[in-house]
Amino acid sequence: MLQKLRKMRTNENVLIAVDILLHSKSAFMNVFLMAFMIRASLKDSPASFLIYCIVRYALMGIFSIVLLRLTRRHTLLAWRTSMIFSIFQIIGVIFLNSASPYFPFVIAVFSALESVLYWRPKMYFDTTEIADDRRLHFKSVGQSWIELAKVAMPVVLGIIISNSSYVRTANVILIISISQLLLSMMFHPVNKDGKVKKAEEHTIMDVMRFMLKHDSMHKIIYLSLLRGIIVSSAGYLMVAQINVYRSAGSDLNLGIFTATASAVAIVVLWLYRRASHRARLQKTILFSILPPAVLLPLCAILFPNNPVIAIVFYIYTQSIIESFYNSTLTITRLQDILSRHLRDDSYRVEIESIAEVFLSVGRIVTITIVLTLINLGLDYLLMPFALLSSFAIFPIVYLTLPSRMWSRDKIRA
């Protein structure tokens, strides 16, 4: 018994450490990758980065279905394999010619495989390998270190890139990725390999028929699609990223703006959670930070090339839209739907995979529109497009408000 407790404590520390390292390099493969690809292009165009995003999200949707059995039956293998693909991804950044038309495709394949193979096993281990009396401590300690990494690492990476180069900085990220893999070797599940009984597995078509039969499951499709259209790395956020790149002037400034966005997200989330027992105050917070989603693109249209507006727009989209609305409200609501409307968890994994497909569809549609406008030389229409797509956030808020939720009656799977 004592040996089991020690093993679970070690597993807890490994999960926290690996997650911190993952978030430490997230900015490197996001806003800094965008800046790198734009500079490497012949016309200083973000087209190659947008192609990378489209391919990545398309593959994430496909892999979430294709690799479903692997992530269910061989959870530990899938988790460790994700870190191997992360290493391949960074090696590709170091050795591939960034001006090559194949560069965004190769990096996108490794990135999609890493994401799909990492997160589902990670969520499974968070549930099965953490003792009930340690779960609150695990979440609070892990989240605190992750928040620190999100604030500090963009600035650190910005300084390193500004004084060397993106490719040389990739060597630092490669060390972080290798460290992740080595740490994962210290993880030994108490529940061996996380295998799921065959009787609990269902085909995707069975689950689709189940979802189409029940109105409550329709809400998962709507919410996932809307997430992809605006709040989850969608075209709206891409416009803000492209706009801030043109105003930042340096990678260090990009790092500072990204770190500021992370700090703002932490404060807003803290205020929202402090008001958890006061529904009216929570709604006040929710609606008070909603108008800038529309007003900031409008200001950018009225005052083009204004760096202050570009910076504020970027910080708002990253902190409020991406971190708060997407990572907190919508994901929490999706899990709440599954918990309230399924009597057992036999369909949960398949439903989450189908939701990932609809999320990818929403992302691809809006990013493709942004790419088309850029390729046609219609860059001046990017902000009007962002303004138009910003109205999609209102139905998202409608769906995520507890008072707007559907019936409490559960349906039988």
Where are the language model's segments positioned?
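Helix-to-loop junctions at the C-terminal end of transmembrane segments
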Residues: 62-76, 161, 267-281
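Helix-loop junctions at membrane interfaces in 12-TM secondary transporters
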Residues: 95-108, 301-315, 325-329
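Transmembrane alpha-helix termini and helix-breaking/packing motifs in multi-pass membrane transporters
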Residues: 31-41, 67-69, 152-170, 364-386
